[in-house]
Amino acid sequence: MSWQAYVDEHLMCEIEGHHLTSAAIVGHDGAVWAQSTAFPQFKTEEMTNIMKDFDEPGFLAPTGLFLGPTKYMVIQGEPGAVIRGKKGSGGITVKKTGQALVIGIYDEPMTPGQCNMVVERLGDYLLEQGM
């Protein structure tokens, strides 16, 4: 299965009539492996800061998580494994695997829990596959 198929079929799938706004699978180096059409353009520095928060949990808390034009307030995640952010009625979930970051961005009517489930389920699967 191609990386694009993982994004299209596993991240952008419909859940209870809703789906993510955008999603991507990005290497630890910031290289995009696959993304949905609406995924924001981001700076390498933004991916570097996300990776730093996985190594040093809490790194992003004072400044927020920036991805493209959006700043998310970092909320409770799982240190070293999952970063979650909130902005208004939407947010972001980032799951770290051995080689990649699985990223999902949502807005209402999708809920934070639905986003977490979709992103973390694929991330856990990739971890099980040695990715």
UniProtKB/Swiss-Prot annotation:
Molecular function via GO: actin monomer binding; proline-rich region binding
Presence of the UniProt keyword Cytoplasm in the record: yes
Pfam families from the UniProt entry: Profilin (PF00235)
Residues bearing the modification Phosphothreonine: 111
Any GO CC annotation of this UniProt entry: cytoskeleton
Main subcellular location: cytoplasm
PROSITE patterns in UniProt: PROFILIN
Keyword Kinase: no
One GO BP annotation of this record: nuclear migration
UniProt PTM comment: Phosphorylated by MAP kinases.
Disulfide bonds, paired cysteine numbers: 13-115
InterPro entries given in the database record: PFN, PFN_euk, PFN_sf, Profilin_CS
Subcellular location: Cytoplasm, Cytoskeleton
Chain span(s) of sequence motif Involved in PIP2 interaction: 81-97
SUPFAM superfamilies: Profilin (actin-binding protein)
Note: The variability of the residues taking part of IgE-binding epitopes might be responsible of the difference in cross-reactivity among olive pollen cultivars, and between distantly related pollen species, leading to a variable range of allergy reactions among atopic patients.
Quaternary organization: Occurs in many kinds of cells as a complex with monomeric actin in a 1:1 ratio.
UniProt similarity note: Belongs to the profilin family.
UniProt name for this protein: Profilin-9
Lineage: Eukaryota, Viridiplantae, Streptophyta, Embryophyta, Tracheophyta
